[in-house]
Each structure stands twice: as C-alpha cells, then as structure tokens.
Amino acid sequence: MAEAAPARDPETDKHTEDQSPSTPLPQPAAEKNSYLYSTEITLWTVVAAIQALEKKVDSCLTRLLTLEGRTGTAEKKLADCEKTAVEFGNQLEGKWAVLGTLLQEYGLLQRRLENVENLLRNRNFWILRLPPGSKGEAPKVPVTFDDVAVYFSELEWGKLEDWQKELYKHVMRGNYETLVSLDYAISKPDILTRIERGEEPCLDRWGQEKGNEVEVGRPRMMGTGLPPYPEHLTSPLSPAQEELKEGQAPKQQQDSEARVAPAGPEAGGGVAIKTEAQSEDEMTPERLFLGVSRGQTECRIPRGPRNRPGGPSRHQAQGMPRVRAGEPRPPGASGETPRVLSRRRQRAFPCPDCGQSFRLKINLTIHQRTHVEEGRQEAPGRSPTSCGDSQAMLEPGEVVVPGPVIRWLPEEPEGRRSVAGGRALVGRRPAASKMYHCSECLRFFQQRKSLLLHQRLHTGNGQGWPACPYCGKAFRRPSDLFRHQRIHTGERPYQCPQCGRTFNRNHHLAVHMQTHARGQVGPHFPAAPARHGSLPLPWPSRKEEG
C-alpha cells in the first residue's frame, strides 16, 4: 500500500500558491561564469592546435626544399660521373693503342736480340776495333765479362764456405746482368751456364774449365773455344825485335814499343795484334789461374771474313800486322792494317801475400780466405799468434777470440807508386797489437773504449747510455750530454774577448773570432785559433771523457 502523505499546513500552502505565479525565481551567476570560462578555454585550445599544425607544415616544407636541393646535387654529380666515364674510356682506348705499339716494338727487339745471340753462339762476327782519337788518345773499349770476372781453381773452390760460394755466384750473375743492361752484345759465359746447371764453377788442376776437352798444354780463353795464345804469337822474337835488340835500343824505348809478330800459315783468318807486355803487378786472372808465362801476350783473334769489301778488313784478312813508322817491317808485310790499342786493366785491390790484384774488393776478400785456410792446414796445432803474449796483454775479464786475419802491406820506398790503380800502396802497421771483439755483431776494434761505446748500441732504447736529467734524452758520449745540458741551463761559458758575446760551444767562438780577424787583428786575441785547446775549456774535452 502506498504510504500516507504527510499532512500539509493549510496556511503554508496558501502562501505558496499566492507567491509562485506572480514572482519568478532568479538564475544563479555562478553557472553563467563557469560557462563563459569553459568556452574561453576551448577557444585557446583550438588556437594552439592550429599553431602547432602550422609549425608542422613549415617543417615539412623545409624538408621538402632540402630534398629538392639534394636531388639536384645528385643529378649534377651523376652527370659529372658520366662525363668522367666517357673521358676515361677515351683515354683507355689511347693507352691500349700505345700498349699495342709497345708490344710490337718489343717483339721486334726480341727478334733482334735473338739474331745477335745466334751470331754470338756461332762466333760468326768480328770484334769491333775502334780507331784512336784525333789527339792520339786510346778509344773507350767496351767492357767484357772477363774484365769483371774472377775464376777459382778446384783447390781454391773447395776451400770456400757455402755462403762464400753463394756470394760468388750472386756476384757473377750481377756482373753479367749489368753488362747486358749496358747494351753490351755478349753471349752467356760458360761459367754462368754451369751455375744454372748446378755444377761447380771452377777450373780443374790444369787450368781448364770442367766439362770441356781441350789440349792440356794450351789453355784457352774463358767462354771461347779458341786457344788464347796462338803459336805465331808465342813464338820467339820476330826479326824486327832482333834488329832492335842488336841495335841495343834504350830500355825505355823497348818497353814503350809493342812487340810485332808476323802472321804464320797457322793463323788462317786470324790477325796478329800488337799488344804491350803487362808487368807483374798487372797480372790478369787468366795468367794467375791458367799458368800463362809473363813473356806471352794476350789478344783476341776474330774468325770469319768481313762483309765490307776493301778498307782495313782487306788487309786484316791477309794476316798483315800493323807496325809503327820507323820500325822495320816483317817479311811479307805490305800495306797497313788497323792498329789495335791494348786496354790496360786497372786493379786497385792487390793481395799483400801473393801480389795478385783484383778489380773488386769482394774478390780480394774471398781470395784472402784461401790464404787463411792454407795457413791452418800447414800448421793445424799452431795459432796465428803466440798464446803467451796474448794472454799476458789481456785485462781482467777479457778473452782473445779468433777473427779475420788483418794483413798489412810492407813499407815501400818513398816516391814509389803501385802500377795497379795508380795509387800509392804504403802499408802502415796498427798502433794496437790486439783487437777487441764484439760478441753481438762480430766487429773488431783497436781500442777498448771504442768497443764499450759500440756495445751500447746493442742494449736497446738507450739503456746504459748517459741520459739528460731534464728531458731524458740519451747520448753515446758524456761530452755530448754536457753540451746538451747547456741548452736547458742556458750556460754560455765561452766569451769573445773582442765584443763580449758568449757561446755555448768552443768552435762557435772560434768561427765568431774569425769574423773579427777579417777586419783587424788585435793583440789580445788571435786572428784565427789554430786549435780548440788554445781557448779555455771549463768542461772536460772529448779525449778526457773517452
């Protein structure tokens, strides 16, 4: 059931009915203000959103412009690359054409070289004889392989060590390659052929090359199949020489004039060549190893006729020697033949033991090893130096080690000069009687302090060297450290007595004083100091520091 409605007061109801239709209720102000505020907030939010959108549009527009610029740059680079590719293609075509031309020229040059090698192998050529100069000077004769080659006998080759043999082979190959690079038309020597085949490049006991059968009594030239000294050249004196001998010509005239020998019937197509007899100091390897006597002369005998008619070749084919004006002609000589000047061999490295001269120092070093081995074989139980003398000269902690034998040439009289090389070879014995040996690099020194200074090189990173306390830089000598420290301290102990200027080194002061000496020479200072010892030396000198 519905609840009963509360009872109303009749007076209250009546009062309410009277007021409601005549007076309406007013709207509150708070609700109006809140509505206006919310509307304003909504408007500002819309404005902010519009501004953010405008910023995004501007950013997108900027990026679009940047992309357009980069696209244009890429297009330009692409166009440049296309141009470069076209130019490179054109250059490549030109280089290919040049390369083809070079290949053709190389083929022609190779064929020419093959033809020259065939001529050299067949020995179907004449040796070039250069005429003398306008002033009578000797012509420049091309270098041959025998001029720079050294040959060893079988005994000497057996005494060499393996590394010395390899060094010898390397030097011989280098000499041949050098001559070929200088455009000398020479064939490959037999010694290089044996080296390539793995054979020993030495001579047998008779002075002949191994693997070649020639007459024992007549040694032949290296690299040729002909005997170097024909019978008509090694024969006794010719009639021209006999006449000079009977006339008792001066010795100088006999030495200056060459020997002339007539062409015998055995010469064939050869030519008698006038040469000068070499002295004992100018002995060549052919004489030393092949056992040629001093009375024989060396020459080259061409074989085969010349292609050019007439001229000097016509006389040479007849075997007629050339003689000087005023000399008696040999029998059967008519006309003149070209003159061949002998080439003097300059060998500036003589051996002090046997007198043999060498053109290269390495050949002398290898040759001296043979003397050392011979000395050891002759006296195997005897050392080169006396043990008692060497032990008596040793200091505590030092030992004598075996090293290379240092040989000194004997004293020569004043004014005498060696023939080989044109230089004086006056030997001087060392001041020190023993050598100091470095165990690291096998070097020898005459003074102990030199060995101590040298051993600092093997310590590494400047260990054991005096170092600067300011910058830590290490020096080999204490005197160098003292001079270096003056850079940090600013000390200038050397003062000029003329102008008062100071220097940190003695020789700087000496150079400075020479400037004053050019203008005037005062009584208080020398014009030019003769030596550093004339000036005050507050610091120890190089000799005192050791």
From Swiss-Prot:
Subcellular location: Nucleus
Biased composition (Basic and acidic residues): 1-18, 242-258
Keywords: Acetylation, Coiled coil, DNA-binding, Metal-binding, Nucleus, Repeat, Transcription, Transcription regulation, Zinc, Zinc-finger
Low complexity: bias regions: 302-312
Region (Disordered): 1-30, 218-270, 291-344, 372-391, 527-546
UniProt feature coiled coil, ranges: 48-124
ZnF (C2H2-type) intervals: 349-371, 436-458, 466-488, 494-516
Domain KRAB: 143-214
Superkingdom of the source species: Eukaryota
Pfam families the UniProt entry points to: KRAB, zf-C2H2
Record-listed N-acetylalanine modification sites: A2
PROSITE patterns named in the record: KRAB, ZINC_FINGER_C2H2_1, ZINC_FINGER_C2H2_2
One of the record's GO molecular function terms: identical protein binding
One GO location term (cellular component): nucleus
Main localization (coarse): nucleus
Function statement: May be involved in transcriptional regulation.
Protein name per its UniProtKB record: Zinc finger protein 783
Source organism: Homo sapiens
